[in-house]
Amino acid sequence: MEPQLVAVSVLVSALICYFFFRPYFHRYGKNLPPSPFFRLPIIGHMHMLGPLLHQSFHNLSHRYGPLFSLNFGSVLCVVASTPHFAKQLLQTNELAFNCRIESTAVKKLTYESSLAFAPYGDYWRFIKKLSMNELLGSRSINNFQHLRAQETHQLLRLLSNRARAFEAVNITEELLKLTNNVISIMMVGEAEEARDVVRDVTEIFGEFNVSDFIWLFKKMDLQGFGKRIEDLFQRFDTLVERIISKREQTRKDRRRNGKKGEQGSGDGIRDFLDILLDCTEDENSEIKIQRVHIKALIMDFFTAGTDTTAISTEWALVELVKKPSVLQKVREEIDNVVGKDRLVEESDCPNLPYLQAILKETFRLHPPVPMVTRRCVAECTVENYVIPEDSLLFVNVWSIGRNPKFWDNPLEFRPERFLKLEGDSSGVVDVRGSHFQLLPFGSGRRMCPGVSLAMQEVPALLGAIIQCFDFHVVGPKGEILKGDDIVINVDERPGLTAPRAHNLVCVPVDRTSGGGPLKIIEC
């Protein structure tokens, strides 16, 4: 028996060593990007990470350089923190990184069929083309402009009423409500209360689930993610199933009554849900759209169109409250271009360069999605470093925006850095993925398709708010902060996006005395 026990012990030890050190064997001899020498069995370098991954990666880049690698369990992860390597990975080697990272939460909550996370291929190309033509193209964006204006006016009325009563407003929640209503009307023709689900989904998408990286824990729910994911799935699926079923019944009733013409929001504009339901009935469609595809796309646009837009507007307001001189300067620009008798509109924004610069500076310091994530689908070489297939890529947009090698005084909120000076093109930095020092929407084929909508909606919303109101910030104990006491917490909360850790609560102050632009919307 004793020799048999020895043999079994040796076999078990060999298996354990093989699985623990398999990453070393598998990649032996390859010139991988620099990596911390010490890593623990099973978890690899996970012990070096905090709850905010982009900040942890930023700190590690100071020690290991602009391109380094980490092991999350047995999974190799590559982190890029400079415009040069961002361009090498997202443009030069774009085809090798044309897929997104799909976690357990992403797969479940997007029905494995979303535009944002679907593998690059025929389905993804078809859905992107459909989305750009029918929802995110210039024609559709312009068609829904009046609806965005209505939601902005509704928020301004709320702020005006609270200003008269000298009552506090949770700006964070009101911005989420507005952006959720906008994308909901564009998607399904009516405002839906989905913002709580959306915030929870974006949070869990960005949280670190060890079961996604360590084979030993694949079937274990050590952090309770499984239950949270299932609860979120049921909440969202119930909501979206009700929406789809209601629309299907409406379509049946119209056909039964012999009615034809536009459906959707009821104002002559077709929403995206109607178009998707048409696709399910089209036998000649190049890709057969099914119910799960519709649910996945609604999830896509609810999460992408609600949280990111609200976050960017809130961060801009925070920075303007902290920097009164910048706030005064942009108000002077608005007064000179728009006047004092009407509200800022989307059509005004191209003529408001300082307002646009404020938005870009906000994206630099507070990108709504702090990292561009990809999965390597084919081994490639970057600057003599080998990136193996199935490696995960993180381009740290947050870190790039705070790098003193590319930005003077990077922690200072200074919109002037984005203004075009006469005879100098240094201020001409676009946000559409061609300038790799500023990538709030990513770059290449997989960049955010909603960039045009965001660049129309956010500056007009921000401009209208600051045109009409000042704000007294409310402290954590309910006190109004004044003078040197105005210290706004800028900590971030973990998640796929980078919202503030604490809601922005303010008492609005009407700077128009109920006249001017607010009088037009009958405040």
UniProtKB/Swiss-Prot annotation:
<dbReference type="GO" id="GO:0016712">
    <property type="term" value="F:oxidoreductase activity, acting on paired donors, with incorporation or reduction of molecular oxygen, reduced flavin or flavoprotein as one donor, and incorporation of one atom of oxygen"/>
</dbReference>
<keyword id="KW-0408">Iron</keyword>
<comment type="similarity">
    <text>Belongs to the cytochrome P450 family.</text>
</comment>
<keyword id="KW-0503">Monooxygenase</keyword>
<comment type="pathway">
    <text>Secondary metabolite biosynthesis; flavonoid biosynthesis.</text>
</comment>
<dbReference type="Pfam" id="PF00067">
    <property type="entry name" value="p450"/>
</dbReference>
<dbReference type="GO" id="GO:0005506">
    <property type="term" value="F:iron ion binding"/>
</dbReference>
<dbReference type="GO" id="GO:0016020">
    <property type="term" value="C:membrane"/>
</dbReference>
<dbReference type="InterPro" id="IPR036396">
    <property type="entry name" value="Cyt_P450_sf"/>
</dbReference>
<keyword id="KW-0560">Oxidoreductase</keyword>
<keyword id="KW-1133">Transmembrane helix</keyword>
<feature type="transmembrane region" description="Helical">
    <location>
        <begin position="66"/>
        <end position="86"/>
    </location>
</feature>
<dbReference type="GO" id="GO:0020037">
    <property type="term" value="F:heme binding"/>
</dbReference>
<protein>
    <recommendedName>
        <fullName>(2S)-flavanone 2-hydroxylase</fullName>
        <ecNumber>1.14.14.162</ecNumber>
    </recommendedName>
</protein>
<dbReference type="GO" id="GO:0102469">
    <property type="term" value="F:naringenin 2-hydroxylase activity"/>
</dbReference>
<feature type="binding site" description="axial binding residue">
    <location>
        <position position="448"/>
    </location>
    <ligand>
        <name>heme</name>
    </ligand>
</feature>
<keyword id="KW-0284">Flavonoid biosynthesis</keyword>
<keyword id="KW-0349">Heme</keyword>
<keyword id="KW-0472">Membrane</keyword>
<dbReference type="InterPro" id="IPR017972">
    <property type="entry name" value="Cyt_P450_CS"/>
</dbReference>
<keyword id="KW-0479">Metal-binding</keyword>
<dbReference type="InterPro" id="IPR002401">
    <property type="entry name" value="Cyt_P450_E_grp-I"/>
</dbReference>
<keyword id="KW-0812">Transmembrane</keyword>
<comment type="function">
    <text>Catalyzes the formation of licodione and 2-hydroxynaringenin from (2S)-liquiritigenin and (2S)-naringenin, respectively. Can also convert eriodictyol to luteolin.</text>
</comment>
<dbReference type="InterPro" id="IPR001128">
    <property type="entry name" value="Cyt_P450"/>
</dbReference>
<dbReference type="GO" id="GO:0009813">
    <property type="term" value="P:flavonoid biosynthetic process"/>
</dbReference>
<dbReference type="GO" id="GO:0033771">
    <property type="term" value="F:flavanone 2-hydroxylase activity"/>
</dbReference>
